Amino acid sequence: MGYRSDVGLALSKAGAEQLREELRALNKNSETFSETTAFLNATDKHLKHEATGAELYLWSWLKWYEHYPDVRFMEDLMGKLESDDFLFLRIGEDMNDNEERGNFWDNPFELSILRTITSI
């Protein structure tokens, strides 16, 4: 069980390059490296915008717990990035649990939060 979230992360070219640099700096035998590479490979969607080098990562129904090594790595990465190099969006299970960080709003993926009411 546990609390689940949907997470989106848009990275500018510089942000994506820093992600790769931070991964290369990890000990390849560490839990953080194995958990983070598995996490990045298990996205629901990963897109690269060829013209700009920006990248998009989307995960759904994810446990975003800061004590998990992969989440800690991503949190640390966002703490190091310039705010214009990333946009992090998280929607939790609770209606009022939305999180936005970073200023990469002019990303080529138009990443945003949208809550709607629908019917049949």
Pin down the residues of each PLM region:
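Short, extreme N-terminal segment that most often corresponds to the first beta-strand
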Residues: M1-A25
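Charged interaction segments
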Residues: R24-I120
